[in-house]
Amino acid sequence: MPPKIYVIHENSEWVVPLRSAFAELNLPFEEWYLDQGVLVYSTPPPLGVFYNRMSASSHTRGHRFAPEYTSTVLAWLDSHGRRVVNNSRALQLEVNKVAQYAALRTFGIRTPRTFAAVGADNVIQAASHFSGEFITKHNRAGKGLGVRRFRSQT
């Protein structure tokens, strides 16, 4: 029998096609719904393959700390040498636009002029560096949530 596949997520909608595919292929799997939990670090994780489907937009579904908890679980899996698809690095990129842009640039992919600003006053200050239209996007959102277009700084 193949090793069990553990699907790490916090959004059941995203797992529907996986459930069907795994059932069709007769692959054993288990879902780890990580919107919250307790990790006993001294206990080794089960053997298997871990597929990380955690999303930066989890907070939009009421799961504010799911990425942080998933990061903890991934570190635990890594410390035991478990195979993880979409590992800690993937999660880091998921929750950090600057890290995403840096990774894209290492492959020669251009990214827009970017300022990282935290706090309302700092966002306004960063906006003053643009002479025309600009777009804001926060680190944690999917489906275009939080994207705003401004025609000017005022």
List where the protein language model places each region.
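Small/polar loops that bind or transfer phosphate-bearing groups
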Residues: 7-10, 151
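Active-site nucleotide/adenylate-binding loops and adjacent lid/helix of ATP-dependent enzymes
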Residues: 79-81, 88-154
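Conserved N-proximal alpha/beta basic substrate-recognition cap immediately N-terminal to
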Residues: 10-113
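Extreme N-terminal starter segment of soluble prokaryotic enzymes
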Residues: 1-6
